[in-house]
């Protein structure tokens, strides 16, 4: 269920939007006009459902700002697939595949999401080679990242996978050695296929070894070299 705080149509938002700028080209006025007239920006609060598994996909969805988690309900339990940082497209394989959302996406922070008419987006792909190429690159990078996470989950121990998560938050998501965990320890355990007790124990060990400092949900990485070694060898 959506808990939408506001919906608005922005006449000039598309000119400077990263959705356009990331394609490394200046779209023609006709294309910009088509985007301006066929999109809606929705603000979601932390915890709101952006995409729900099993529902019909009718729009291209672009995360303009904020953080979200991608998760799927399997035969036995719900599995967190990955954490998504803006700017990023959400659910493109579903939108251009069988049109039924194969996973859910939930906001981990307040987030602005752009819903773009799928037919207009298809036209942009056909008319703009550079834009189409940027979308292909996005999909390829996402797939390679999924392969890497899958290999790590199955071949690394919990200690190494937890180090990966902390390094990912530090280097990719927050770009800082001091950050607040956007997910609970239970969610971290789900993300790395471990138990909450193991996550809690490993975090305590990392604090005891002065590799990290933890105050509530705030993490400060004190010894990144050691954390990287744990990631590589554990």
Residue ranges and their predicted role:
Residues 65, 88, 119-120, 186, ...:
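Alpha-helix/helix-capping structural signal
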Residues 169-234:
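Phosphate-/nucleic-acid-contacting segments
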Residues 23, 33, 48-109:
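Cyclic nucleotide-binding regulatory domains
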Residues 71, 92-93, 123-124, 165, ...:
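Residues that scaffold the ATP/ADP-binding catalytic core of kinase and kinase-like folds
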Residues 2-46, 89-90, 94-96:
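Cyclic nucleotide-binding regulatory module and flanking cytosolic helices
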